[in-house]
Amino acid sequence: MSTHILPEAFTQPQPCSQPPKEVHLVTPSERQVPYSGHVKPFIMVTTRPEHEAARDEYESFLTQSGLSRNELQHIALEEVDFFGSFTAADVSGVLIGASPYNADTPTAEKTRSQLHVEDQVRELLAVILKEGIPLLATGVVLQVLAAYLGTGTREEFGEELGAVDLFLTAEGREDPVLAGLPQAVTVFAGHYEGVGEVPAHATLLASSPDCPVQMLRVGRNVYACQFNPELDAARFEQRVNIYDEAGYGDPDMSEDILSHARSSEVHDAGQIIRNFVSHFSRT
């Protein structure tokens, strides 16, 4: 697998274009208060082909972020050309959601939709890395980013859908986007493959027993996590039900998954989204 050459600024931790600032830990009770209208918007990019799931994902990120709809604008890669809509100077940052696609599906077996989305994500990652745009990506996008940096995925690092225990590394405990989280965190996740090695130029921030690379950072402002920080227990149940209705899941198995999820003490991983927004918002 070929490795893309990163701009020199990304081979070592460098300051982003805006001066670093302290993170204000936004609490759940504060998160509905919109940011100032002078802040440049964040862009939420959804990669899911199912419209209901994509809308639900946007609403989950919106709720967790504390932004208004104008401050967190939604783009579905299936429908809109990101680069025809925004430039790096227009935005505070980008958030990219997960999808039901598997990065290691043989090319001949991938749908046209998956191929299009993967091409768009790779192109978007290239621009983000080149321009230094702050990014928070989730799910399969971590795998696409790892592949872009020369590291593949393996099925042995997949995790069943449900609550997952992960642990912050020393670097993760010092990172402003993970500020306020305990060293051991329980979150929602579920994926067929995972990344087992930290890619070149990346810093490992969180790991789990079954998936060594749960969250990483490239440079100072590009983040990717394998889990779903936007999901709380209610949103997780809603997401599972949406995919059941779309014919992806087994209702009996889903009930077992939901029963286990209801009994799990999941942390407020949405703090990651709020920290990201607080740290990288710019005028």
Per-region residue spans from a language model:
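Amide-donor transfer/coupling interface in amidating biosynthetic enzymes
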Residues: 3, 27-38, 44, 90, ...
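Acidic, Ala/Val/Gly-enriched low-complexity intrinsically disordered segments
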Residues: 8-9, 22-26, 33
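N-terminal beta1-alpha1 ligand-phosphate binding loop
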Residues: 34-38, 42-57, 62-66, 76-78
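Glycine/Thr-rich phosphate-binding loops of Rossmann-like dinucleotide-binding domains
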Residues: 52, 103-105, 146
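Flexible gly/pro-rich beta->alpha loop and the following alpha-helix that scaffold active-site loops
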Residues: 70-136
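Ligand/cofactor pocket segment of small-molecule handling proteins
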Residues: 141-144, 148-188
